[in-house]
């Protein structure tokens, strides 16, 4: 039999480790050696921040991939929002998980890998959103000339809000509503988008008035500082806003995607306030100037009309001149009227005399004879006409009397009476049937009640057990030894005391 010393390595001086020991040693070596490293790579598989506030992703390059995690505390200190595909430089420490032989970097700080990477990402996003029409100039809204309420989305503690309020107060004091947001960091974009959407959802007649124009403002800063205003959700919220939006982010040389989506871009927050409201003094001066111009124009208008009236009055002839011709025509017509009346009277007199000569007694006598003859003829025709009329009326009366015979009415009356008798008989029969049915149903219910009644159960030899409170006992498990019970039989109650060790007989053994 071969000795154990014959196996290779049996007498070697190499230390022997368990899996846990070698994994722990490897963990200590990695964490000691790479306790503080800077890693450059592209963000891949970004997931976060979760409800816990942590974010998980990987850093990769062309040949390798390193898992990464940012805990909640470090995540809140980032000056930008990590995004898929962004090239960054991460500072942290490497650690391993002995249970799964995996390692990752726990990131404590992270920054974009130079402005070039951010500019490339910004240009790609700009082209994509522009293709969707979010920057279309035809969709821009006009700013109201005289807004009543202005909504401002900015930090409530910075110099920006003070400059805006001060500028508005100097130009035209009105109501300003501030929606406080963070203007830098990972939560900047979501908070700005929420503020714009929140202002748009305010009702016109609510306790908080709906603004007529919005100002999204922030002071100057680096590309990383302003990165939250390049967030896609901010651009979409501003483009979808029904309230005109003025973008005032950074200095005049700075630009962000919100500037392209807004309805107006201001070089500074103070400039945004100047765009939003006019100067009250300028309005008053303009109003006074226009009022003076209106008064001057009205004076000139009335002077011109007054001069035209005077010129027309001078050109108009006098009353005597105007009435001279009509007066002469009236006098001529009056003289002609006198002559015409005389001539007409003479004509009428001659015509009357001619008719008077025609009215001789013999002519009147002849006319009277003709009238008497006509009356006589009508008197002879009248009896025959009257008899024919009466005969026609009598025939019509007889015809109508025949139509009004009582026989059809009597026949209809008899038919109606027969129908009423049938209905009476059917009603009486239905009432009797209903009464019998109700009586039978009542008898059945009475029998059922007697069968299921409490007394019927006792009559059949059963008994009911009550506890000390007089409540029925439904289960043996509800009774404890020594409990005072009452057993009710058909003819009375018996008091008993429960004992221990009783068994429940099997009802099937006696069969």
From Swiss-Prot:
Highest taxon, organism lineage: Bacteria
CDD domains (alphabetical): ExoVII_LU_OBF
Keyword terms of this UniProt record: Cytoplasm, Exonuclease, Hydrolase, Nuclease
Catalysed conversion reaction: Exonucleolytic cleavage in either 5'- to 3'- or 3'- to 5'-direction to yield nucleoside 5'-phosphates
Protein family: Belongs to the XseA family.
Role, per record: Bidirectionally degrades single-stranded DNA into large acid-insoluble oligonucleotides, which are then degraded further into small acid-soluble oligonucleotides.
Name of the molecule in the record: Exodeoxyribonuclease 7 large subunit
Source species of the chain: Brucella abortus (strain 2308)
